[in-house]
Amino acid sequence: MNDRMVWIDCEMTGLSLSDDALIEVAALVTDSELNVLGEGVDIVIRPPDAALETMPEVVRTMHTASGLLDELAAGTTLADAEAQVLAYVREHVKEPGKAPLCGNSVGTDRGFLARDMSALETYLHYRIVDVSSVKELARRWYPRAYFNSPEKSGNHRALADIRESIAELRYYREAIFVPQPGPDSETARTIAAKHVLPAQ
């Protein structure tokens, strides 16, 4: 893998891959130091009428409050949205299959990308960097860091959510990770030796 990280967030009409539609996708690419490269993209997608009609009320309320619902009629197609995101990603990630998908609880996003934007999804490495995993570990191992983490606006717009995820990982990197350059090789080998599982 190279040092690039592809941050993607999706907004949907719900969480069901069989019934719900992708309505917004945003992407930012960072380097390994979490510096954002370029302007990123944020695209509203016009969903099928059926997906709007069956949208759960809690989701409708959320997308109304964020202003996203009002923008859907002027949204673009899935194919056009994918082309725009892929063009931005390719500008900063030259080789396919090298950069991981990053974000918060990105397993759900990856499912919708695999269904609706397969060229984009397969351009990414199969690994993911999920900030929610770091957060769950911090809650268990470093509760003070967890409970003092940066507040989120919670406006449920894709690009804002990505920016918050990047800021959150920056925070956890500083608050709970070993400062760079980390342990020397001998120390790392000593620690590793303590965690080698016995042969079966």
UniProtKB/Swiss-Prot annotation:
Keywords: Cytoplasm, Exonuclease, Hydrolase, Nuclease. This is Oligoribonuclease. Its main location: cytoplasm. It comes from the Bacteria. Residues 5-169 form the Exonuclease domain. Transmembrane segments: none annotated. GO terms for cellular component: cytoplasm. SUPFAM superfamilies: Ribonuclease H-like. The keyword Translocase does not apply. It is found in: Cytoplasm. 3'-to-5' exoribonuclease specific for small oligoribonucleotides. It comes from Streptomyces avermitilis (strain ATCC 31267 / DSM 46492 / JCM 5070 / NBRC 14893 / NCIMB 12804 / NRRL 8165 / MA-4680). The lineage of its organism: Bacteria, Bacillati, Actinomycetota, Actinomycetes, Kitasatosporales. Belongs to the oligoribonuclease family. Its EC number is 3.1.15.-. The active site is at 126. HAMAP family: Oligoribonuclease. It is an enzyme of class 3 (hydrolase). One of its GO terms (molecular function) is nucleic acid binding.
